[in-house]
Amino acid sequence: MAAGIGSRFGGGIKQLASVDDSGHIIMDYSIHDAIAAGFNKIVFIIRKDIEKDFREVIGNRIEAVCAQKGVEVGYCFQSLTDIPGSLPEGRTKPWGTGQAVLAAKELIDGPFAVINADDYYGKSVYTSIHDYLCQDHPDNAFCMAGFILKNTLSKNG
């Protein structure tokens, strides 16, 4: 998911901020780890207004890498118009994870994992989730990667 508006970030598109000298962003690492774990489809859930920048910073590069590895790439757009029912007056922000998954409903046709574009989870998480998703489970079975809070916070919280 990369449709957040980054209102606390302080400028630019948070999901597209470089984290190293080579211009990689957190999603580069996440996608690499997911593919290595066995995931074979990447769906970017973004806002329509960042599509051009998104494709320039990461989309085109990831599409090329995925094409070499036989991994499918899709795009969908999170929008306030995708909300069933009516919006509270003045609402300007997307509704978060649930609404993001709803925006991707046409591209999801089996078990899937959802990540935030600006969080790094680590290689083992993708392997654990992929292994779980490849097992037989009842239709109403779900999983979540859990973390020990003190191991996830910086000195600044």
Predicted feature residues:
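Residue-level signal for inorganic ion chemistry
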Residues: M27, A104, D118, I148
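A short, conserved beta-strand element in the Rossmann-like catalytic core
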Residues: G6, Y120-G122
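Conserved core of the sugar-phosphate nucleotidyltransferase
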Residues: K123-G157
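Short phosphate-binding loop-to-helix
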Residues: E63-P111
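Short beta-strand-to-loop acidic/aromatic patch adjacent to the donor-nucleotide binding site
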Residues: D109-Y120
